[in-house]
Amino acid sequence: MSGIPNTRMRRALGCAAVMLFAAVAGGCASLQSWIPSIPPPSFDWLTSMFGGGKKIAPLPDFPITANAEIAWQVNIGKSAPGLAPAVTPNAIYAANSSGTIYRIDPANGAVVWRTEAGRKLAAGVGADATLVVVGTDKGDVLAFDADGKARWQVKVTSEVLGPPRVAEGIVVVFTGDGRIHGLTAADGQTKWVYQRTNPPLTIRNYAGGTSSRGGLFAGTAGGKLLAIDLATGNVGWEGNVATPKGATELERIADVTSLPIVEERQVCAVAFQGRIACFDLVRGELLWTRDVSSLSGISIDNRFLFVADDAGAVHALDKVTGASAWKQDGLMARKAAGAQIAGDYLLVLDPQGYLYLLDRSDGKLVGRAATDGTPSTAQAAQSGANAVWQTQGGIVYAVTGR
């Protein structure tokens, strides 16, 4: 079990019903927060989110030598986990929990249009150049065109989890019953459905999937990475990111809960209580692994793969070999998560809405800025030189480092 002491796991048993959901015994309510923002299961940290328990440490002191520049910000209304901006070359789409969908100009943050879904939303946004897709906890999938006009709506088998993926004429929808649905982008009709049996206990997964070269790459409960043909739903290959270990179901959780990253001819993913693994994009051959556990996802530049681990330490690994380039542990007490490229720097976030800039070459802390004081709904996405994310308070930020 990677990086999580047994004592911490025993403490986590008391909050498992809050943080996790069981596929048996009637199921437990899931934690209404951004799951990828949390460190390894810790009762103290979880209760602090609701005003009790121990608070995270004071802000670290370091010389500010870079400017975390907020290029623009848009208030769209309170947003739940599972809602995250969709970045396309000419537009950013975002939605709030009450059902309002926005198209935002990525150059300046101007709202191009807004439209109403007519119901509360739990998942989205997925988009390409012509289609914008959102989902509800009732299993409704709603599609709009790039001008905000309703195109179609269909119902799938269970609640929609995380942003749909729109690519190659297919809308991919992930549902709470473990299914992956391939819908035709033209009318929403089901083209294929993939299903696998989930372990008894899993982390609620809001990540969705990544598409490239006609394939969908998606992580699963139990630590697998799937390569699925978008046209047919057939599995091309299955890679092992992590292997469940331990005596209890809680200890055996080894889920891929963040977006895989496709870079050149490899695809990489990270698992909670597991490791980072990179595979050949076409053949699925394992290229390298590194024992780093994370819920909050990875990003890649021309040299390194970046990840914030479950304890809040930030790592840079050689993207070809997995060798460690540097490790920054100065934000562990702040529960840093969600590493993403922002201009010349690496950006990470903490649960109190602070963002930090790190020098990508050596991991040195160089900048900091405050946002609205609420956690992110998901890992930041990249839009040109900006990192773009949405907070639970309802602000969409575009930030770069200078």
Q: Which sequence ranges carry the predicted segments?
A:
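Short loop/turn segments that connect beta-strands within beta-propeller blades
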Residues: 105-108, 145-149, 184-188, 230-233, ...
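Blade-level signature of beta-propeller repeat domains, shared across WD40, Kelch, NHL, RCC1
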Residues: 365, 371-402
